[in-house]
Amino acid sequence: MNSSARTRRDLPESPYLAAVNGRKPHRVPVWFMRQAGRSLPEYRALRAQHDMLSACFDAELVCEITLQPVRRHDVDAAILFSDIVVPLLGAGIDLDIVAGVGPVIASPVRTAADVAAMKPLERQRVQPIADAVRLLVSALVEVPLIGFAGAPFTLASYLIEGGPSRHHARTKAMMLADPDSWHALMEKLTDITVGFLRVQLDAGVDAVQVFDSWAGALSLANYRSYVQPHSARVFAALADYGVPMTHFGVGTAELLGAMSAALKPAPATVVGVDWRTALADAATRVMPGTALQGNLDPVVLLAGWPVVETAARAVVDDGRRAVDAGAAGHVFNLGHGVLPETDPGVLTELVSLVHSL
């Protein structure tokens, strides 16, 4: 076992850690992807003074932004404020985050020579993230902290496309036309992802979530051939830390079993489910002993409280059916991130409702 696993916080009262470890929590745990973000006025006030990348590398700012939704909403977990491309910066990739666009890569990676020129993650470059984790572990007291990283496929898509993409056409074309370069790229990105998560785990995060945001663009056959082995290596490399690990993607109903299998070496495994798939159905698709996370449609939060309440109750009921169907536990979340236009008061009320059910 990794030495850091022996010194990790003991949080026996955490509903989140109970649910993901297959124990019965004293209340339904709830947190939200992108809970620290543009829906919060206090976040917008801070970001008015800092661009996204500088915010991600300022330990005290990362700490404050991560804590904001915990204070406001009483969620059962904090997730480290970061961006999916931060580890790419740690590996020397020239990129920027452009308002209204997202990450933009200065020199996309599209050839064998481009792949060969890529450098490994330098831990010193991401030292502020470790510093932020240490601050947060001290400040959160009884609330677990979830570490954060993008999965190799999603990082590959940003690198190959040069930024966000609707169809991931260049990515899939390279994958199919030049599998040698593809797998070489995925090996390097796997090492970067593992290194970035090790930085967070060594600093004390209590769990990790790996976001494969764009994996839903793939068929099951292509996912298994070109992606799953690399994602599986991420989780296998981190298994000795002894922390729960979550694997999440959007539009991945047909991939849930394979995404669950990639998690297999982890001591406690969680698969995130989006709103398109019923949790009880997802429970039959994942590996035995897997907990589920999700899956309220983020748009529901814009539809008024009566709609939110009805939908939230349905998700909690579906989560209980999922546990009856074999899921190890259920963590209430959205099926994707909080939308910027979401009323934070609705989120606070939603947390209170879920805790009461």
Curated annotation (Swiss-Prot):
The record marks 83 as: Transition state stabilizer. It catalyses: uroporphyrinogen III + 4 H(+) = coproporphyrinogen III + 4 CO2. One of its GO terms (cellular component) is cytosol. Its EC number is 4.1.1.37. Keywords: Cytoplasm, Decarboxylase, Lyase, Porphyrin biosynthesis. It is found in: Cytoplasm. Gene3D superfamilies: 3.20.20.210. GO terms for biological process: protoporphyrinogen IX biosynthetic process. Its main location: cytoplasm. Substrate binds at residues 34-38, 83, 158, 213, 336. Belongs to the uroporphyrinogen decarboxylase family. Catalyzes the decarboxylation of four acetate groups of uroporphyrinogen-III to yield coproporphyrinogen-III. PANTHER family: METHYLTETRAHYDROFOLATE:HOMOCYSTEINE METHYLTRANSFERASE RELATED, UROPORPHYRINOGEN DECARBOXYLASE. Homodimer. This is Uroporphyrinogen decarboxylase. It comes from Mycolicibacterium paratuberculosis (strain ATCC BAA-968 / K-10).
